[in-house]
């Protein structure tokens, strides 16, 4: 029995990055030998075991053979005669087909170290094309390592295009698509994930609402980048710089979906695109089974982001109604989230990346003022039932009006 550290832990160590999870491959062992050594079996489809002390995963070396459609249609063979090299050959990318033995020696039969140095994401073998999930995984790796200047090898990208054109991605379950997307959205450059999907044709298949934005023009005065799809990826990049929060990034990605519905004869203007996009956000989230909290914020951002941009001319009554509409009294975090997504929208434009966004500050300040109006005083004044809410709203509007007069400059005529 020989044990090797494999995959991401070896890759990230060679890149000088923190190693989070360790996966191990065991060569020359049977399931019974693993159980006798105190390991706990957890794998159903193939033998995977948990170490009795570290609880890290130890998998018996195995090979895989395509036996059906999609990413689950594989027959696995795990036995003591499976070599380390055979196990590494079934992996997706050469940089993931690396192993390290007890002496610290790197086993690299597929030239993963060479591709690490060249900053290349390259598939190990033609078997890559048998698993459609790998299209998304490569896109996610491209996003994860974009700051290190990694790129996808030309032949790998060509294979991803072939897989997409062959309809392989249609076999992916919504849960797997969302899981890969969720992980990509938390990387330093999530926009790269969606750009790669577009480059290989997968964006049109998996995210048609986003793909539809490319080629849709916006007024050059406000959007020097012109293309709404380009703007969407720029705003996502900006959101990633402004916040690590998944919900902020996802809502930013979806903020302009309504522009994909604008009739061509009305281009480049998109009046009412915010509210129009709400149903597309709902459609996308329902299809991919996006968590409800992310969906709800994305719908609010789609509906109200343009309103935030006009904050200096908003009436105090409108501002308080906005807080009602986003349910800020029960979910105060939404004020900050919407401020950040609106800022990402404005700064996610060519030439505006370093712009100040005072509307975000004013939104936060107005919220603090409205929130500070005490409910207790309204109750003590004798108001009852629905009259409490009505009086509280009046006082909040008055407080915001007083603040706005002092702190929020009126736009020049």
UniProtKB/Swiss-Prot annotation:
Q: Keywords, A to Z?
A: ATP-binding, Hydrolase, Magnesium, Metal-binding, Multifunctional enzyme, Nickel, Nucleotide-binding, Nucleotidyltransferase, RNA repair, RNA-binding, Transferase, tRNA processing
InterPro entries noted in UniProt: CCA_bact (IPR012006), HD/PDEase_dom (IPR003607), HD_domain (IPR006674), NT_sf (IPR043519), PolA_pol_head_dom (IPR002646), PolyA_RNA-bd (IPR032828), tRNA_CCA-adding_enzyme (IPR050124)
Keyword Nucleotidyltransferase attributed: yes
Q: Identify which cofactors the protein needs according to its UniProt entry.
A: Mg(2+); Ni(2+)
**Segments forming domain HD:** 228-329
Q: Which residues bind ATP?
A: 8, 11, 91, 137, 140
Which N-terminal residues, if any, form the signal peptide?
A: none
Q: Name one Pfam family in it.
A: PolyA_pol_RNAbd
Q: Which residues bind CTP?
A: 8, 11, 91, 137, 140
According to its UniProt entry, one GO biological process term is: RNA repair
**Catalysed conversion reaction:** a tRNA precursor + 2 CTP + ATP = a tRNA with a 3' CCA end + 3 diphosphate; a tRNA with a 3' CCA end + 2 CTP + ATP = a tRNA with a 3' CCACCA end + 3 diphosphate
Q: What is its EC number?
A: 2.7.7.72, 3.1.3.-, 3.1.4.-
Where is Mg(2+) annotated to bind? Answer: 21, 23
Q: How is the cofactor bound?
A: Magnesium is required for nucleotidyltransferase activity.
* Any GO molecular function: CCA tRNA nucleotidyltransferase activity
Q: What does this protein do?
A: Catalyzes the addition and repair of the essential 3'-terminal CCA sequence in tRNAs without using a nucleic acid template. Adds these three nucleotides in the order of C, C, and A to the tRNA nucleotide-73, using CTP and ATP as substrates and producing inorganic pyrophosphate. tRNA 3'-terminal CCA addition is required both for tRNA processing and repair. Also involved in tRNA surveillance by mediating tandem CCA addition to generate a CCACCA at the 3' terminus of unstable tRNAs. While stable tRNAs receive only 3'-terminal CCA, unstable tRNAs are marked with CCACCA and rapidly degraded.
Q: What family is this? A: Belongs to the tRNA nucleotidyltransferase/poly(A) polymerase family. Bacterial CCA-adding enzyme type 1 subfamily.
Question: Misc remark for this entry?
Answer: A single active site specifically recognizes both ATP and CTP and is responsible for their addition.
How it assembles, according to the record, is: Monomer. Can also form homodimers and oligomers.
Q: Which NCBIfam families match?
A: PRK10885.1
Any domain commentary?
Comprises two domains: an N-terminal domain containing the nucleotidyltransferase activity and a C-terminal HD domain associated with both phosphodiesterase and phosphatase activities.
Tell me which HAMAP family the record gives.
Answer: CCA_bact_type1, CCA_bact_type2
Q: What is this protein called?
A: Multifunctional CCA protein
């Amino acid at each position: 029995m020989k044990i090797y550290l494999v995959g991401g832990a070896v890759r990230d160590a060679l890149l000088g990055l923190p190693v989070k999870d360790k996966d191990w491959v065991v060569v020359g062992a049977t399931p019974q030998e693993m159980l006798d050594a105190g390991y706990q079996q957890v794998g159903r489809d193939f033998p995977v075991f948990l170490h009795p002390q570290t609880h890290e995963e130890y998998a018996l070396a195995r090979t895989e053979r395509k036996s059906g459609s999609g990413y689950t249609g594989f027959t696995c063979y795990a036995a003591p005669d499976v070599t380390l090299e055979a196990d590494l050959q079934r992996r997706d990318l050469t940089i993931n087909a690396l192993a390290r033995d007890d002496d610290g020696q790197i086993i690299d039969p597929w030239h993963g170290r060479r591709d690490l140095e060249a900053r290349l994401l390259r598939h190990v073998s033609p078997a890559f094309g048998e698993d459609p999930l790998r299209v998304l995984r490569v896109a996610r790796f491209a996003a994860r390592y974009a700051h290190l200047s990694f790129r996808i090898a030309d032949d790998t990208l060509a294979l991803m295009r072939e897989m997409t054109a062959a309809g392989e991605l249609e076999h992916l379950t919504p849960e797997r698509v969302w899981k890969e997307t969720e992980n990509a959205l938390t990387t330093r450059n999530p926009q790269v994930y969606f750009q790669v999907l577009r480059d290989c044709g997968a964006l049109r298949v998996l995210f048609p609402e986003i793909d539809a934005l490319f080629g849709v023009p916006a007024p050059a005065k406000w959007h020097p980048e012109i293309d709404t799809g380009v703007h969407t990826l720029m705003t996502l990049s900006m959101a990633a710089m402004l916040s690590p929060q998944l919900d902020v990034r996802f809502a930013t990605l979806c903020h302009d979906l309504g522009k994909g519905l604008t009739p061509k004869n009305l281009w480049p203007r998109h009046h009412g695109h915010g509210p129009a996009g709400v149903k597309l956000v709902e459609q996308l989230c329902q299809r991919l089974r996006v968590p409800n909290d992310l969906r709800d914020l994305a719908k609010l951002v789609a509906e109200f982001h343009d309103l935030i941009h006009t904050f200096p001319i908003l009436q105090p009554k409108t501002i308080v109604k906005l807080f009602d509409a986003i349910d800020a009294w029960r979910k105060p975090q939404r004020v900050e989230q919407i401020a950040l997504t609106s800022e990402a929208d404005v700064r996610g434009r060519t030439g505006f990346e370093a712009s100040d966004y005072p509307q975000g500050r004013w939104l936060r300040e107005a919220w603090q003022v409205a929130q500070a109006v005490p409910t207790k005083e309204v109750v003590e004044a004798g108001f009852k039932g629905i009259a409490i809410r009505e009086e509280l709203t009046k006082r909040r509007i008055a407080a915001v009006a007083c603040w706005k007069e002092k702190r929020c400059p009126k736009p020049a005529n």
